[in-house]
Amino acid sequence: MFQFNFNDFILFIYNLFFPAVRILALFSTAPLFNSKFIEKKIKLIMAFVISWIFSSFLPKVNIAIFSVDGILIIIEQMLIGILLGLTMQLIFSSIFMSGEIISLQMGLSFSSLFDFNSRSNLSALSHFVHIFLLLLFLEWNGHIWMLSALFDTFITIPIQKIYLDPNIFLKVVNFSKYIFFDSIMLLFPIIIVQLLLNLSIGILNRVAPQISILSLGFTVTLLVGIILLYFFIPIFPSSCIVIFRRLQSFVLTLFNS
């Protein structure tokens, strides 16, 4: 006959709740999972299902949720999840910024679309780069790797009353400059060619104003930009995979002491 044990039930809730806090914090900042198109109820269900799976492999936690230690652990889980998600978001933000620069140089900044995630108008080229990057991330099984990296954090930083090393935040800041540099270098040839083209158009307009080169400037920059993108797109996936792997190596060592 089945006997209900209230203490075992409370212990089950504790072991389900604390991992779910870290998972929900990751979902709030990590790429793909932080999409506004995914309903909050779906995210909540996913978080508790993943937490239930993870809890089977983790040490048991017997700390009351509403105690002082429990509140400190909740804050710690939120910090770990948010930090991990923001670290993964760096690649998308940096490449997204590069797309905005190219769009501005091509004269496509006026062609904007409303982005539901950022609640702002963004250029069509930036939307294209963002969607392309998301598809590459899925093709690379980035969503699975993200959950695997999250599970590894439960091994390196178990659910208990500990204090995060402040150097972790410095690691993320130092890593962000390398990611932004790699992302700019990824699209650097297009940026340089467009810059030289705009500079040449400006010089020609000053040397021979009767030609009225500025009337053709927009058409020329747009055409050259499209041609450059045509030759650049085939090498874009392999370059992004290199950046993804660099992110993977960094995340594996982020929470290691």
Curated annotation (Swiss-Prot):
Keyword Transmembrane helix belongs to the record: yes
NCBIfam families: fliR (TIGR01400)
Keywords per UniProt: Bacterial flagellum, Cell membrane, Membrane, Transmembrane, Transmembrane helix
Known role: Role in flagellar biosynthesis.
Stored InterPro entries: FliR, T3SS_IM_R
Transmembrane segments: 12-34, 44-66, 79-101, 121-138, 145-164, 179-201, 214-236
Pfam families: Bac_export_1 (PF01311)
Family according to the record: Belongs to the FliR/MopE/SpaR family.
Topology in membrane: Multi-pass membrane protein
Cellular compartments annotated: Cell membrane; Bacterial flagellum basal body
Protein name per Swiss-Prot or TrEMBL: Flagellar biosynthetic protein FliR
